[in-house]
A protein has these predicted regions:
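Catalytic core of PPM/PP2C metal-dependent serine/threonine phosphatase domains
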Residues: 41-112
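N-terminal entry segment of metal-dependent catalytic domains or homologous docking segments
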Residues: 1-34, 39, 46-49, 134-137
Length: 172
């Protein structure tokens, strides 16, 4: 909302987060509905709810994400929206994980003093054509390492040096 060139803060956030376990897999899910306010909130909330239901029903992450992308594409034809998705599937016993991305902002893995930026080039879910996507990256989280997912507005690929420096200096 704009009034005389001044943006008024939104009361509702378009970002949604879920953390849940299915068997020995821990899922971290971040979705950012496109746009602002209530419409963005609804898109992200629906995305998180459906994806969580698919995964809890035993559907593999790639199949669940592709199904969701197809459903969002159909909704888009009827005036629905689209959303970014970051999904980390982490195997609790080993720390091995896979990060899936649909149009999401960079994510960051810190291991020792090294921070690695993990990016993707795919479009948001609902805009990605065909069977392309999601992009996936294999990760290994070991004792003392940590992983950070952010939505747009926190950092992007051209302006995230401050975040990488902050993470590199953090020992927590």
């Amino acid at each position: 909302q704009h009034e005389r060139g001044i943006e008024r803060p939104q009361r509702v956030c378009g970002d949604q987060l879920a953390i849940f376990e299915v068997g020995s897999t821990l899922y971290l899910l971040l979705s950012d509905g496109m746009g602002t306010g209530e419409p963005a909130h609804r898109e992200a909330a629906m995305t998180v709810r459906l994806l969580r239901e698919f995964l809890e029903a035993g559907i593999e992450p790639v199949s669940a994400l592709r199904t969701l992308n197809a459903a969002l594409m159909l909704r888009g034809e009827e005036g629905g929206g689209f959303t970014t998705i970051d999904l980390l599937a982490l195997q609790r016993p080993t720390g091995a994980g896979t990060l899936y991305k649909y149009g999401a902002a960079p994510s960051y893995l810190k291991r020792g003093g090294c921070v690695t930026r993990v990016t993707g080039q795919s479009l948001p879910a609902g805009l990605q054509q065909g069977a392309d996507g999601p992009e996936s990256t294999r990760l290994s989280l070991q004792a003392g390492s940590f992983f950070v997912m952010v939505s747009d507005g926190v950092a992007d690929e051209t302006d995230d040096e401050w975040l990488q420096n902050l993470m590199a200096g953090w020992s927590g």
